[in-house]
C-alpha cells in the first residue's frame, strides 16, 4: 500500500514523467530480454506500436507492379525505401484495403466446400431460435461432449490418410484406405476440391474438422448433442440459462441417436431368442443405419450407452470400465471389495441368493437426470450425496443407491413376492428383482430406512422419506447437494468378455452390463435403420412379418426348393420362419405343421401333384414342431390386423394372392415380388432343382438298371449314370456331374432337356 502511494506521488511530478518518456533504454539486460529469440515478448504492445508507424507491413517486391503507389485519395500505399535487412518493400495498411477492393478476384466456388462446417454453423444459428433468459442456480456437471457438429466418425489415423490422399496426393508415404467411409469421403472430396486455390494447409485443417470427432470434458446442464454444445457460451452461465432451439440437425448427432435406438432394439430382440449372443451378432452385422453398416459405426462411434456397449462387447471391442446399474453409470473412485454369495430373507420371508460386495468403496453415480457420490461398506450405506433436476430424479438415484448398498433394512422392506421376469420370461437376478420392486413403490423402503438430525453444511440439505427437503433431519446418510457430480472423464477402454446371455464382465469377472440395464425407452430414429435380419421383422408388426417371410422364400427359392426336396428338416428349422410362428394361433401351430408336412411328403412321393405357389404358401406353417394327427384343413388362420385371417390351402385369398398372368405375389394387398420360374410347368421347377448336379443324357437306357426315385439319386457317385423316374411316370437317363461348378446352369437346362428326352 505504501509503495503504491509513493508511486502515485512520483507520477504526479512532471520530472518523473519526462524521465520515463524521454530516456532511452540502454540497460543490456532489458535489451536482451526483449530482443533475444524469435518469440515476441509483448505481442499486444508490438502490434500497437507497429500500427502507429506509416509502413508496418513488408511485402514481396512484386507488389510494386500489382499495387499503385497512391490510392484514389492520394494516400501513399508503399514506400520506395527498402525494408532494412531484406529485399522486401515497406507497405502501408491502406494497401491491404486497396487490394481487398481492387485486387484480382479468384473463384469463390471452393470456399463453401472447404469451410463447410463454418457455413453450416452460420445457417444453424440463422435459423435457430433463442428464447428468454432465466436466472436460476445451474447444476452443471462435466460430461464428455462432442464439440464439433457435422463430422464423420473417422479415427485420427483414418482421417490422416484421407487428408493426405486428398490434399497431398503426390506426397510419398503409404496410405491405406480400407473402410467404406474412407473411400467414399476421399472420392467425394477429390471431386469437390478440383482446382482449389485455397492454401493446402488450410484445406487440411478444415478437412480434419469434418472427419474427426473432437470431444471435450465440459460443464453442461442442458442438451449434450453437438448442436447445443456449439452455443454453450450463449445458453448457460453460472446463474442463468437461455432457451435455444437449434436451427438444424447434423448427421453425427443423428447417427448417435439412431445407433442407440438400433442397439436397444437389437439387444431386446436378442434376449428372447434361443442363442442371444449369436443372434445379436447376426443382427449387428446385417443392420444399416443411414446407409452405413452398423458394425462400422460401432467401431468408430464413442457413444457410451448400455445397449451400444453390449453390442461393442459382442464384437470384441473395448469399452469403458464403468458399470451400469439401474440406469446409472457407476465408477469406483476408491476402495476395493471381493464378492461372496449370501442368502438373505426378504420381509416376505422369501430367500434370495445375492453376491455381497465385502469392503469399503466409493463410487460416482451418473444418470441422465441425477448424479451422486456414494460411500459404502459391506451391506451398509455410509453416505450418499445426490443432486438432480427434480424430486422424482433425486428419488430414482436414492432408490438405486439403497438397493446397491445391499443393506438389510432394504431387503426387509420388500412386501409381497419378487417374481419379475425379463422379455424372455426368465427370472431376473436378485439385485434386479429388488430394484424393480422398489422402482414400482419405494414408500416402505424410505419409511423403514431411518432418519437422522443433520448439521448445517453449505450447499447441502436433508431429504425426508416423502422426498421433501429439510434443513433439520434427513434420511440416514443421505444429503441433497446443489452441485452435480462430474461424469467420469477418462476415455480409457478395457478388454471385456461377454457370455451367451449378453452379460458383459471385466477381466476380474465383475459384471459391467447386462440386458436388464438396457432402457425400455422407445424413440423414433432420425436416420433410416434397415434391419435385414429376419429377427427384426416383427419390429414393424405382424403384417411386416408376413410380407418379409414370403419375400424371403421367393428371393431364396432356388436353394429353398432343393432343400424342400432333399433335406426338408433342415429347411423347417431355418430361423427365417421363427417370427412367422407368432402369427399362427398357438393351439393350431402343431396341427397345421403336421398337416402341411404330410402334404409335402405326399408331393415328394407322387411327383406331379403340386405347384410351386402352394409350397411357398404353406412352407412357413411347416416350421412349428408337428403334431401327428389325421386332421385336414382347407384353410389356415394367421393373426394379422387384429383378427384371424385365412390363407386357403388351394386357391387365393386376400392374405396370399398369386396372379398367374403377371406371376406376382401380393400379400395383404402389398406386392411381395415375382416368381422367376413358371409354376404352371407343374413339376419341372422342383425336378430341375432336384436334378441340379446331374446331367440329363436322354431317354431311359435299360442297361443302367431299374428307374430310381428322385430321392434315391443322392446315393450316386460322381460320374455314375442311372435311370430316374420323373413327373408323370416318365423315365430319363442322368449322370451325376464330376464337378460342382456347373451346377447353377443345370436347373435351367434340365427343364429343356427333360422335355426333349420325353418327347
UniProtKB/Swiss-Prot annotation:
Gene3D superfamilies: Polymerase Basic Protein 2, C-terminal domain (3.30.30.90). InterPro entries: Flu_PB2_2nd (IPR049110), Flu_PB2_6th (IPR049114), Flu_PB2_C (IPR049115), Flu_PB2_CAP-bd (IPR048298), Flu_PB2_middle (IPR049111), Flu_PB2_N (IPR049106), INV_PB2 (IPR001591), PB2_helical (IPR049113). It is found in: Virion; Host nucleus. GO terms for molecular function: RNA binding; RNA-directed RNA polymerase activity. Its main location: virion. The keyword GTP-binding does not apply. Disulfide bonds: none annotated. GO terms for cellular component: host cell nucleus; virion component. It holds the Pfam family Flu_PB2_4th. One of its GO terms (biological process) is DNA-templated transcription. Keywords: Cap snatching, Eukaryotic host gene expression shutoff by virus, Eukaryotic host transcription shutoff by virus, Host gene expression shutoff by virus, Host nucleus, Host-virus interaction, Inhibition of host RNA polymerase II by virus, mRNA capping, mRNA processing, Viral transcription, Virion. The record marks 627 as: Avian adaptation. A motif (Nuclear localization signal) lies at residues 736-739. Belongs to the influenza viruses PB2 family. Plays an essential role in transcription initiation and cap-stealing mechanism, in which cellular capped pre-mRNAs are used to generate primers for viral transcription. Recognizes and binds the 7-methylguanosine-containing cap of the target pre-RNA which is subsequently cleaved after 10-13 nucleotides by the viral protein PA. Plays a role in the initiation of the viral genome replication and modulates the activity of the ribonucleoprotein (RNP) complex. Influenza RNA polymerase is composed of three subunits: PB1, PB2 and PA. Interacts (via N-terminus) with PB1 (via C-terminus). Interacts with nucleoprotein NP (via N-terminus). This is Polymerase basic protein 2.
Amino acid at each position: 500500500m505504501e509503495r503504491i502511494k509513493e508511486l502515485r506521488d512520483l507520477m504526479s511530478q512532471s520530472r518523473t514523467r519526462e524521465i520515463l518518456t524521454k530516456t532511452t533504454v540502454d540497460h543490456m539486460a532489458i535489451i536482451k530480454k526483449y530482443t533475444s529469440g524469435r518469440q515476441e515478448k509483448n505481442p499486444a504492445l508490438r502490434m500497437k506500436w507497429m500500427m502507429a508507424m506509416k509502413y508496418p507491413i513488408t511485402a514481396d517486391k512484386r507488389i510494386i507492379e500489382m499495387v499503385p503507389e497512391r490510392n484514389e485519395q492520394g494516400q501513399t500505399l508503399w514506400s520506395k525505401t527498402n525494408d532494412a535487412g531484406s529485399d522486401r518493400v515497406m507497405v502501408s495498411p491502406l494497401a491491404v484495403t486497396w487490394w481487398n477492393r481492387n485486387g484480382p478476384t479468384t473463384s469463390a466456388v471452393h470456399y463453401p466446400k472447404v469451410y463447410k462446417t463454418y457455413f453450416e454453423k452460420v445457417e444453424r444459428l440463422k435459423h435457430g431460435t433463442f428464447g428468454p433468459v432465466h436466472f436460476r442456480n445451474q447444476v452443471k456437471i462435466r460430461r464428455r461432449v462432442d464439440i464439433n457438429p457435422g463430422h464423420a466418425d473417422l479415427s485420427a489415423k483414418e482421417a490422416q490418410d484421407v487428408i493426405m490422399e486428398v490434399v497431398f496426393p503426390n506426397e510419398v508415404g503409404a496410405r491405406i484406405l480400407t473402410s467404406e467411409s474412407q473411400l467414399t469421403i476421399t472420392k467425394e472430396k477429390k471431386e469437390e476440391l478440383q482446382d482449389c486455390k485455397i492454401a493446402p494447409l488450410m484445406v487440411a485443417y478444415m478437412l480434419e474438422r469434418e472427419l474427426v470427432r473432437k470431444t471435450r470434458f465440459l460443464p453442461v446442464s442442458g442438451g449434450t448433442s453437438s448442436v447445443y454444445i456449439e452455443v454453450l457460451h450463449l445458453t448457460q452461465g453460472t446463474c442463468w440459462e437461455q432457451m435455444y432451439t437449434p436451427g438444424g440437425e447434423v448427421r453425427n448427432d443423428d447417427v448417435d441417436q439412431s445407433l442407440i435406438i438400433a442397439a436397444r432394439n437389437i439387444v431386446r430382440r436378442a434376449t428372447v431368442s434361443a442363442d442371444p449372443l449369436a443372434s445379436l451378432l447376426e443382427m449387428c452385422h446385417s443392420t444399416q443405419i443411414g446407409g452405413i453398416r452398423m458394425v462400422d459405426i460401432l467401431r468408430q462411434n464413442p457413444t457410451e450407452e448400455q445397449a451400444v456397449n453390449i453390442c461393442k462387447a459382442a464384437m470384441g471391442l473395448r469399452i469403458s470400465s464403468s458399470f451400469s446399474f439401474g440406469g446409472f453409470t457407476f465408477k469406483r473412485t476408491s476402495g476395493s471389495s471381493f464378492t461372496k454369495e449370501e442368502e438373505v430373507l426378504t420381509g416376505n420371508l422369501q430367500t434370495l441368493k445375492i453376491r455381497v460386495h465385502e469392503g469399503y468403496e466409493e463410487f460416482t453415480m451418473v444418470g441422465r437426470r441425477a448424479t451422486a457420490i456414494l460411500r459404502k461398506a459391506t451391506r451398509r450405506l455410509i453416505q450418499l450425496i445426490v443432486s438432480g433436476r427434480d424430486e422424482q430424479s433425486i428419488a430414482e438415484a436414492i432408490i438405486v443407491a439403497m438397493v446397491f448398498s445391499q443393506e438389510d433394512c432394504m431387503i426387509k422392506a420388500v412386501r409381497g413376492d419378487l417374481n419379475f421376469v425379463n422379455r424372455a420370461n426368465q427370472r431376473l437376478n436378485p439385485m434386479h428383482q429388488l430394484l424393480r420392486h422398489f422402482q414400482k413403490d419405494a414408500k416402505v423402503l424410505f419409511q423403514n430406512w431411518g432418519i437422522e438430525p443433520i448439521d448445517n453444511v453449505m450447499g447441502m440439505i436433508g431429504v425426508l422419506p416423502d422426498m421433501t427437503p429439510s434443513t433439520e433431519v434427513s434420511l440416514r446418510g443421505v444429503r441433497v447437494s446443489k452441485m452435480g457430480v462430474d461424469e467420469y472423464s477418462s476415455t480409457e477402454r478395457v478388454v471385456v468378455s461377454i457370455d451367451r446371455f449378453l452379460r458383459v464382465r471385466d477381466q476380474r469377472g465383475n459384471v459391467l452390463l447386462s440386458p436388464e440395464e438396457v432402457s425400455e425407452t422407445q424413440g423414433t430414429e432420425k436416420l433410416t435403420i434397415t434391419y435385414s435380419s429376419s429377427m427384426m421383422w416383427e419390429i414393424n408388426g405382424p403384417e411386416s412379418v408376413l410380407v418379409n417371410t414370403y419375400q424371403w422364400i421367393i428371393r431364396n427359392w432356388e436353394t429353398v426348393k432343393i432343400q424342400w426336396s432333399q433335406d426338408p428338416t433342415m429347411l423347417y428349422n431355418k430361423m427365417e420362419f421363427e417370427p412367422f410362428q407368432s402369427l399362427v394361433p398357438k393351439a393350431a401351430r402343431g396341427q397345421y405343421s403336421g398337416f402341411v408336412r404330410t402334404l409335402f411328403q405326399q408331393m415328394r412321393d407322387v411327383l406331379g401333384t403340386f405347384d410351386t405357389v402352394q409350397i411357398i404358401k404353406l412352407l412357413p406353417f411347416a416350421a412349428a414342431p408337428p403334431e401327428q394327427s389325421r386332421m385336414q384343413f382347407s384353410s389356415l388362420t394367421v393373426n394379422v390386423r387384429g383378427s384371424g385371417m385365412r390363407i386357403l390351402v388351394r386357391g387365393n385369398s386376400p392374405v396370399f394372392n398369386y396372379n398367374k398372368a403377371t406371376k406376382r405375389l401380393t400379400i395383404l394387398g402389398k406386392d411381395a415380388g415375382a416368381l422367376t420360374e413358371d409354376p404352371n410347368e407343374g413339376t419341372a421347377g422342383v425336378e430341375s432343382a432336384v436334378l441340379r448336379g446331374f446331367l440329363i443324357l436322354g431317354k431311359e437306357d435299360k442297361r443302367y438298371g431299374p428307374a430310381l426315385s428322385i430321392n434315391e439319386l443322392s446315393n450316386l457317385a460322381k460320374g455314375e449314370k442311372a435311370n430316374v423316374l420323373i413327373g408323370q411316370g416318365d423315365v430319363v437317363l442322368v449322370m451325376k456331374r464330376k464337378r460342382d461348378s456347373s451346377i447353377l446352369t443345370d436347373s435351367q437346362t434340365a427343364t429343356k432337356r427333360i422335355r426333349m428326352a420325353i418327347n
